[in-house]
Amino acid sequence: MIKAFIPNFLTLLNLICGCFSIAFAFQFQFDAVLILVLMGVLLDFLDGLAARLLNAESNFGKQLDSLSDIVTSGVVPGIVVYQLFKLSGNRVLDFDLNSYMNPIFNLDLVFSISPVAFIAFLITLGSAVRLAKFNTIDYTDEFEGLPTPANALFFVALPLLIDHVYLIESKEYLLNNYTLITLTISSVILMNVPFRLFSLRLSLRKYDYNIFKILTIVLSIPIILLFGLGGFSLVIILYLFLNVIRNLWSLI
């Protein structure tokens, strides 16, 4: 009983990180969002590790893990991109439903939305599909499609990258509808296509593939040092690029 509690407790901490991230995302405090998501991703790794070490793997824990991940790695990046759409200057529409509903419910129903910004929640839908597929497949050294935590890190780090001093002149090109829509749709595709990506766990069976994993880690360090926390977006791009090279290498 105690053994099962430890990994499940770590999973719930991941969920709490996701909930706090949502609150900060709505306040445009993207640095706090990224830190909390990083903590959630770490806890997501630790709960699985703890379950294996304690021999406490269970179907309950597996389902709880997915439910936590859909918040931290699905809902949070969707909200962050929704906020980016709003920051890009999209038109906000006001809806007044008082004339229709007020006589019945006596409520003040006036709200404002940016319709195009709702495209951001395709990320949440794509993440849900990805996590459902993940529950039916046992991954070892490789993934099929971009893992939801990696996808989440890309998007929650994006606001910080866009505001970085090195990219200030490119901000208008990064923070616009065309870029955000392209990134959103691309992420949904990348999460759900059968494209092989390596995990960062070193393999004792495929020594030649370890070089790509080591390269990912080593090259990530100067990127983070140069771009700060926003560099995590570039690290995910690096990860995808090295996977393309690795897959082409395997064909030779």
Residue ranges and their predicted role:
Residues 140-252:
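C-terminal membrane-associated helical module and adjoining short loops/tails
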Residues 1-45, 224-227, 231-235, 239, ...:
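Topogenic membrane-insertion module of multi-pass membrane proteins
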Residues 14, 18-24, 76-79, 123, ...:
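Helical transmembrane-bundle signal
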Residues 1-15, 52-70, 129-151, 196-211, ...:
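Interhelical loop and helix-boundary elements at the membrane-water interface
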Residues 9-11, 53-132:
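Multi-pass membrane catalytic core of lipid/isoprenoid biosynthesis enzymes
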Residues 20-35, 78-118, 158-179, 226-229:
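Helix-coil boundary and interhelical linker segments in multi-pass alpha-helical membrane proteins
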Residues 10-13, 33-40, 119-126, 151, ...:
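Hydrophobic alpha-helical transmembrane segments of polytopic
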Residues 1-2, 26-32, 57, 104-115, ...:
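Short juxtamembrane and helix-loop transition motifs at transmembrane-helix boundaries
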